[in-house]
Design a protein with these regions (language model features):
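Bacterial Sec-dependent N-terminal signal peptides
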Residues: 1-23
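Surface-exposed, beta-sheet-biased, low-hydrophobicity segments with strongly acidic/polar composition
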Residues: 20-134
Length: 134
C-alpha cells in the first residue's frame, strides 16, 4: 500500500512538472510614455499628438454606478509622406485594444487615460494624460 502511494505521488509530480510552461521571453521591449493635451511624440517616422478629451463619463472610483461609463479622446497620427489622420479612441469597460497605428515594424496602442475620475476632483480641474505603448 505504501508503495502505491509513493508511486501515485511520483506520477502526480511528473504530471504537474510537465504541465508547467517554460517562461517566454519577448525580443521586443515595450516602451510606454504619457502625453498631455497638445503634446506630441515622434516614434520612428510616426508622430502622435494628443488633441483633446472629448468625453469622460467614467464612473468615479469612490462611487457605485450602474454603468461604468467611458472616456473618449482624439489623437492625430502623422506618418512621413502621408496625410495626418485624426482618430477617436474610446476607453470603456470592454478592455479592447485601442491600436492607433500598425506598420511592419511598429504598433502604437493607447493604453489608459489618467487621472481616473474621483468625486473629490472637479472635472474641469483634471489635467489629463494619455498613456501610449509601443
Amino acid at each position: 500500500m505504501k508503495t502505491i502511494r509513493i508511486f501515485l505521488v511520483l506520477i502526480s509530480f511528473c504530471a504537474f512538472a510537465k504541465a508547467q510552461n517554460a517562461p517566454t521571453t519577448s525580443s521586443v521591449d515595450h516602451l510606454a510614455f504619457e502625453l498631455g493635451i497638445g503634446e506630441h511624440q515622434q516614434i520612428n517616422a510616426v508622430e502622435v499628438t494628443f488633441l483633446e478629451v472629448m468625453e469622460d463619463s467614467r464612473c468615479p472610483k469612490d462611487v457605485d454606478c450602474v454603468w461604468a461609463g467611458r472616456a473618449k479622446v482624439k489623437v492625430r497620427i502623422e506618418e512621413k509622406g502621408l496625410n495626418p489622420v485624426e482618430k477617436e479612441v474610446v476607453f470603456d469597460a470592454s478592455g479592447k485594444d485601442n491600436i492607433l497605428h500598425i506598420s511592419d515594424d511598429l504598433v502604437i496602442k493607447a493604453v489608459r487615460l489618467s487621472p481616473y475620475p474621483e468625486t473629490s476632483t472637479a472635472k474641469n480641474n483634471r489635467v489629463y494624460y494619455l498613456e501610449l505603448q509601443v
